[in-house]
């Protein structure tokens, strides 16, 4: 707040002198008196905050704010709207432990003897210019998305600015003097530069869906890519030109950084993620044209675990609306497969077993992948195990009616749907999924129609759709 020119009433036990702040103890009367003190001489305290900005090391301020907030907007002026204020307060109130901030690289470019420039694209475009000369002279900085002007502002030397937009944009940054002459003009180029792509989601399915776009980005921009995922072991040997690191690691010497996740924030992604295919989430953030890309998984099959033909299934997932909730669906499907001479292996980690099937007791990813690999085909839900099966090249029968057919993948997949009932709520822009509500069903929760999207899919519907796979 002080760095934004706002006087502060608060507790502080440090040795740093914070001009513009009235220090108080955690006592209601002291807080009230502190507020009165500032209000009675408000212009004086606003002026005092300038000393704090001059005396306090900016790198310390920014470093500490990175630890405290996930998202930092332009902090060169006070809050301009209640929404901005709420964004900061909500992030602070989450009380999460964030990792050390990424070390940002700055690229100095000398255009005039008296001016020096630093810029990068780590978590949004950043521009700073420094001068040992006239520090009161005003310049105009402009950020462009290609040829389209996005933001323009007056700046004086020895100040900086950055934009809230975090997803990939072909940025161009210019600085002009009061005569309109350009003294700085730089178009972003990532060729040969270090770029950090961080997966925000720890979900197995998200990680598998997104990883091929990281490689696509690396090849497209001819850059050095560092990537953090929660499933690095699944990808490292298959993507040898990507430098994998653990989430939360400090990554140095960067020119750009992009976070990939489900943010529902227009500064972090150009489209609402629940309205588009899962892979388009990352293609949007990285600025890559969307197409369905097959991931590569680090997997080497071992010997066949079962004699005879068998099918792998997974009947568990992470939310109630993902389940195939037909009361006898799985039982009748397994019975049919047994009658056709197939053993059925249930590779779900949790939950009860299905009568007529065998449930794995050793459910490491390596074991699970080996069972899926040697099976005739895989039957599952909209879940990480379906993405895993697809990633290692197994035909997937997916029972999913709450997402649109293109939300997951379409190649090498048999999709089971029933569009005669309520369906596709996941991709409806009117609804936002509530992770904390196991029974989330936005239109019919608490009624007999709850989860009808999957209850209405009968065993016969599934059986009829998989007959072409039966040998």
Where are the regions a protein language model picked out?
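Short, hydrophobic alpha-helical segments
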Residues: 36-43, 66-78, 286, 290, ...
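Catalytic machinery of carbohydrate-active enzymes
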Residues: 82-471
């Amino acid at each position: 707040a002080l760095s934004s020119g706002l006087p502060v009433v608060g507790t502080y036990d440090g040795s740093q002198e914070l001009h513009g702040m009235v220090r108080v103890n955690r006592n209601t009367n002291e807080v009230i008196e502190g507020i009165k003190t500032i209000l009675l001489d408000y212009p004086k305290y606003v002026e005092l905050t300038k000393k704090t900005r001059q005396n306090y090391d900016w790198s310390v301020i920014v470093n500490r704010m990175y630890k405290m907030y996930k998202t930092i907007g332009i902090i060169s002026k006070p809050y301009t709207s209640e929404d901005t204020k709420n964004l900061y307060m909500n992030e602070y109130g989450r009380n999460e432990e964030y990792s050390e901030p990424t070390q940002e690289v700055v690229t100095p470019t000398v255009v005039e003897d008296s001016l020096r420039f630093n810029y990068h694209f780590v978590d949004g475009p950043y521009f700073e210019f420094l001068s040992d000369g006239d520090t009161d002279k005003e310049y105009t900085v402009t950020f462009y998305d290609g040829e389209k002007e996005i933001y323009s502002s007056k700046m004086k030397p020895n100040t900086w600015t950055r934009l809230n937009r975090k997803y990939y944009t072909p940025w161009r940054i210019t600085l002009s003097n009061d005569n309109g002459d350009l003294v700085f003009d730089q178009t972003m180029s990532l060729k040969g530069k270090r770029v950090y792509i961080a997966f925000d989601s720890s979900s197995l399915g998200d990680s598998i869906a997104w990883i091929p776009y990281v490689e696509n980005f690396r090849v497209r921009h001819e850059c050095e890519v560092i990537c953090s995922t929660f499933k690095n072991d699944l990808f490292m040997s298959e993507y040898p030109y990507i430098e994998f690191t653990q989430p939360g690691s400090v990554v140095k010497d960067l020119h750009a950084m992009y976070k990939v996740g489900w943010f529902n924030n227009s500064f972090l992604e150009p489209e609402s993620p629940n309205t588009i295919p899962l892979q388009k989430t990352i293609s949007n953030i990285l600025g890559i044209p969307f197409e369905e890309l097959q991931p590569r998984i680090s997997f080497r099959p071992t010997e066949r675990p079962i004699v005879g033909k068998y099918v792998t299934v997974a009947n568990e997932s992470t939310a109630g609306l993902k389940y195939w909730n037909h009361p006898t669906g799985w039982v009748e499907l397994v019975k049919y497969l047994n009658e056709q001479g197939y053993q059925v292996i249930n590779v779900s980690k949790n939950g009860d077993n299905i009568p007529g099937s065998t449930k794995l007791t050793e459910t490491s990813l390596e074991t699970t992948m080996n069972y899926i690999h040697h099976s005739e085909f895989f039957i599952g839900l909209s879940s990480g195990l379906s993405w895993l099966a697809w990633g290692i090249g197994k035909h997937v029968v997916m029972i999913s009616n709450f997402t649109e057919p293109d939300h997951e993948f379409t190649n090498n997949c048999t999709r089971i749907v029933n569009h005669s009932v309520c369906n596709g709520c996941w991709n409806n822009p009117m609804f936002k999924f509530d992770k904390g509500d196991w029974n989330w069903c936005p239109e019919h929760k608490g009624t007999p129609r709850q989860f009808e999207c999957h209850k209405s899919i009968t065993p016969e519907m599934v059986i009829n759709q998989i007959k072409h796979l039966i040998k």
